[in-house]
Amino acid sequence: MRHNKAGRRLGRTTSHRIAMFRNMVTSFLEHERITTTDAKAKELRSIAEKMITLGKRGDLHAQRQAASYIRDKKVVTKLFSTIAPRYKERDGGYTRIIKLGIRPGDNAPLSVIELVEEQVNKKEKKAKPAKAAIVATAPAVEQAAVLTSPADEPVVAEENAPQSAVKDAVDECEGKAD
């Protein structure tokens, strides 16, 4: 039984799965974005984030650990020189998974996994005009409550009329409708 066993097997032997993820991490760090299935992307995320954390450490031992997993020396250099410094202020969460839909051939759910880019440029907020200026420029509109009876006879209630007069007018209209 497979109780308490973490990770996805993805229908592959252990050696095949390890080789596949080594290739995927190398491609991901080289291109900074790849398209794959949802399950592979979710599993790749943890491995890639561990590699970026090694890159942030930056010592010789971390470089050797990364080189033992990543297949291309140029990608290891890129990890330590360009990718890791980009995330020096960020504690985890270096990747993003965006779902794309399904693959037409086998109906597999596809995703794009990419490195998160920092948003440096923020839009400046425009100053809003004061509300008092807006109210002063608006034309004055007379307030009159118009009540319609079922017989389509409009009953206009005056602005300063007492509530009892309004109720009488409504009752009068309802009496005519019956």
Swiss-Prot record:
Residues 168-178 have a biased composition (Basic and acidic residues). SUPFAM superfamilies: Prokaryotic ribosomal protein L17. InterPro entries: Ribosomal_bL17, Ribosomal_bL17_CS, Ribosomal_bL17_sf. One of its GO terms (cellular component) is cytosolic large ribosomal subunit. GO terms for molecular function: structural constituent of ribosome. It holds the Pfam family Ribosomal_L17. PROSITE patterns: RIBOSOMAL_L17 (PS01167). Part of the 50S ribosomal subunit. Contacts protein L32. Belongs to the bacterial ribosomal protein bL17 family. PANTHER family: LARGE RIBOSOMAL SUBUNIT PROTEIN BL17M (PTHR14413:SF16), RIBOSOMAL PROTEIN L17 (PTHR14413). This is Large ribosomal subunit protein bL17. It comes from Geobacter metallireducens (strain ATCC 53774 / DSM 7210 / GS-15). The lineage of its organism: Bacteria, Pseudomonadati, Thermodesulfobacteriota, Desulfuromonadia, Geobacterales. The gene is rplQ.
